């Protein structure tokens, strides 16, 4: 699955050229033209409104200058790229969470029940405070991972894993609470709340989900 694949002209493909399955050395990255012989794609929409491609490679050949970096050392480059990608989507996610927080607070100020705004109910105030706390924790972790990007690979990887765990957990919590506090309209097509929740759900799966990065953080 290649997110954004329908708009790509070239693909970066990882392939093992030597060694055993679990060896770090022996993996290389290649630039492959999407129109090359042996490359086939099937485009489809994703749940968050984006597009992706299913890519199949069959007997594809590339020239020697298609390799990125030194032969057999592509895993380090790939891992660095993933960590930078995590930092970027963490920043995107906190923007979505802020929007959901703001929209929920505004809705609870205007929606009335029993003659008063539902935002005056203490139990709902507590839930909105919890949403805000999850957002603030995510902001802090996003700052942290961006500050660690230029450090050594181990520090960068641990920061990226920690941030991805926080973003995944907080994004799900904030999205669920926003939908519930908006009531039945929370998942309607006309309201953007449900669309932001879908995007946060997709972000959790990109570059590895919470479970994957918990294990990565523990091993760092």
Kindly label every feature range from the protein language model.
Residues 33-63:
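Flexible, small-/acidic-enriched active-site or ligand-binding loops
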Residues 53-81:
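A short, charged helix-loop
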Residues 30, 55-57, 97, 138:
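Residue-level signal for inorganic ion chemistry
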Residues 77-220:
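Alpha-helical interface subdomain recognition
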Residues 1-4, 47, 187:
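Glycine-rich phosphate/pyrophosphate-binding beta-alpha loops
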Residues 6-9, 23-26, 35, 50-56, ...:
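A generic structural signal for well-ordered coil/turn residues at beta-strand boundaries
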Residues 1-41:
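A short core secondary-structure module
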Residues 11-14, 31, 40, 54-56, ...:
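Structured core elements
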């Amino acid at each position: 699955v290649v997110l954004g694949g329908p708009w790509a002209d070239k693909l970066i493909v990882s392939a093992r050229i030597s060694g055993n399955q679990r060896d770090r050395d022996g993996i290389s990255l290649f630039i492959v033209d999407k129109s090359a012989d042996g490359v086939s794609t099937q485009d489809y929409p994703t749940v968050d409104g984006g597009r992706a491609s299913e890519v199949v490679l069959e007997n594809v050949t590339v020239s020697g200058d298609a390799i990125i970096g030194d032969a057999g050392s592509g895993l380090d480059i790939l891992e660095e790229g993933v960590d930078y990608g995590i930092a970027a989507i963490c920043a995107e996610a906190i923007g979505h969470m802020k929007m959901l927080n703001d929209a929920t607070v505004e809705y609870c100020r205007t929606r009335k029940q029993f003659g008063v705004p539902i935002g005056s109910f203490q139990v709902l105030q507590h839930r909105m405070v919890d949403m805000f706390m999850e957002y603030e924790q995510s902001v802090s972790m996003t700052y942290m991972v961006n500050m660690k990007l230029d450090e050594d690979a181990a520090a960068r990887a641990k920061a990226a894993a920690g941030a991805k765990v926080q973003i995944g957990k907080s994004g799900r919590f904030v999205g669920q609470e926003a939908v519930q506090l908006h009531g039945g309209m929370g998942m309607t097509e006309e309201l953007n709340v449900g669309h932001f929740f879908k995007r946060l759900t997709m972000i959790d799966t990109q570059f590895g989900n919470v479970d994957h990065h918990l294990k990565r953080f523990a091993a760092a």
